[in-house]
Amino acid sequence: MKAFETTIKPLVKFGEGSSLRAGEKFKLLGCTKVLAGYDANINPAVVDAVIGSIEKEGIEVVRYACSYSDGKDDGVIECRQLALDNKVDGFLAMGGGSTMDIVKAASLLVNVDLPEGAKSLVNYFVGHYNGPDLPRHAGLISIPTTAGTGAEATRSCIIASSALGVKATLSSQAAKADWVLLDPEMTKDLPPYFTAITGMDAIAHACEALCCTRSNIYTEMICGKSLELSWKNLPIVYKEPHNMEARANMSLAAYLALTGESYGNCGHSMAHAIGADFHVPHGHCCAWIAPVALYYTRNDCDHEIRLIARSFGLDDKSPTVAKDVANAMKQLVWSLGIKTPAEMGIKREDFIASAPKVMVDPIHLCCHTPLTEDKARELLGEVYDQKLYE
């Protein structure tokens, strides 16, 4: 049996209304002044309620309304500077994956020198930084407002680097929050489009974690359950946005998808490249790519793909199981009204030209089936064409 290790972080409070325990948790962490970073487009009443719970405990709050939807490095610099100027000892990361990653990164970088601003961030990205994990000397609580990105659960911060022209990763065990407040109420007003693409991001995370060189028995237990929940409940929340049982199941599925002590594969390398080149939301990219990435690993991940089939309620004994699963995923994407690359005005030749950036992203190195630039170009062509496998 393959070895693996787990960590106790983050601690999790799950359930409706759990976001209103933020003040209580910050007080337990000993925080006296908190930077609250949140999506600029969140309902102000929701923001006020969470911040009110913190202020009720006598904790001062500095607000940062994050307007960057793609984890842009400028947001990290802004958030970090605000934290330094106000000498905060706690961070609240509330929003979708981009905002959470910006706040997480800022919480790590307040203690390092960045003489060239956003350009200096390059020195701390995976592939450029060889030092020990960056520490965090302040409390950190994450509250996701979507069910899909899983950023609340991970040690990674995905940042759009203006210097590199790619989405890069800042990684540290300290990026994991002290507490995650997993409140389905925070997702109930999410528009159908964002419900769809964040849900597909969760499905992509779990599928890639299984079809990854780091996959293990723990991954199978955790990500198998995540897929069972997301496959059943994503179509429900898309059509019934205020179905709170389904919302709760999706919130849990998204969290579990990134807690299986595994990683990703070529799918997320392609999603990061396409997202950076065409400024398409990450979950939208994952919706296009996930079926193709899964089918690509079919010769090396037969056991895992059959597990995915079982989680989806498909015939795991089928001799064409990989094709069946990939096609079912494509049909789900289409049923959710997610536009194809062509429908978004992207040209095929431009799309496949992102292949070199796929190879720069290190996540593909964990793919069971090795990737080359020529193969990446071929896979991007399959993604663009959006056809069922025959």
Indicate where each model-derived feature is located.
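ATP/NTP phosphate-donor binding region
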Residues: 1-90
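Structural motif
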Residues: 11, 33-35, 62, 89-92, ...
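Active-site segments that bind and position negatively charged phosphate/pyrophosphate groups
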Residues: 209-328
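C-terminal charged capping/lid subdomain of soluble metabolic enzymes
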Residues: 309, 315-390
